[in-house]
């Protein structure tokens, strides 16, 4: 019998949301994504102690640079076992500073360049703030492809498409979490607000011939993944990938390019900020996500500092 994971791979590019090399090898995704939380977990593993030491020794006491060096080292190892791309995230504390985001992104891609990794195998992850989207627009023009993350609203998706970013990561599970907590309803199937959000974005992009890739992220259960089968890409935790690999039920394609979508839109900065202000869920989850990634970045810096002493 064919597993649901193998069925999914027929119409969706499967991406592993992990820094676990062993899991990546066994599950054989096309790409992999990392973030500060996953890097912190990897840094806490004794098996990566040498990688941490090397990252710090080459940073000349600059903790921020050491973190970037460690992130790139993890990315290099991942690229040894995936045929496609790895996403490496910029420090979330820079999410509201366009120039700083560009500078840090260029440093990260420079580290990959030095390691001999082709730029077409790396995506730079930025939070989908207005400043992050503007930074991505500039980076894309300079040949550095981006992954806009922490995406919770249609306004963010519209702005990302207009900016010509390579890929967006709408967060299915975190949208679901907010609405479940807000309403007390346990949404299932096509009624799931996270599923509805990604479906709307996907249909809008395809109807208007945007090339930006839609990669659903942050899944809480298999049903959410199944409802988005056919999406360009889905980045999935190792736990859920294993469940898909063990399930031999039938998986139907839910999303396809021919589905109807809304007319093309564009947003000025003030319109973007107003739309964001009017969307309580998106405002709260974006702020929460940036804070969480920033705290994990700080913990990673503390861990690196402790390792060197």
Swiss-Prot record:
Subcellular location: Cytoplasm
EC number(s) from the headed UniProt entry: 2.2.1.2
Keyword set includes Cytoplasm: yes
Signal sequence annotation: none
Gene3D superfamilies linked: Aldolase class I
Disulfide bonds: none
Family: Belongs to the transaldolase family. Type 1 subfamily.
Protein name: Transaldolase
Catalysed reactions listed for this entry: D-sedoheptulose 7-phosphate + D-glyceraldehyde 3-phosphate = D-erythrose 4-phosphate + beta-D-fructose 6-phosphate
BP terms from Gene Ontology: carbohydrate metabolic process; pentose-phosphate shunt
Gene: tal
Annotated pathway: Carbohydrate degradation; pentose phosphate pathway; D-glyceraldehyde 3-phosphate and beta-D-fructose 6-phosphate from D-ribose 5-phosphate and D-xylulose 5-phosphate (non-oxidative stage): step 2/3
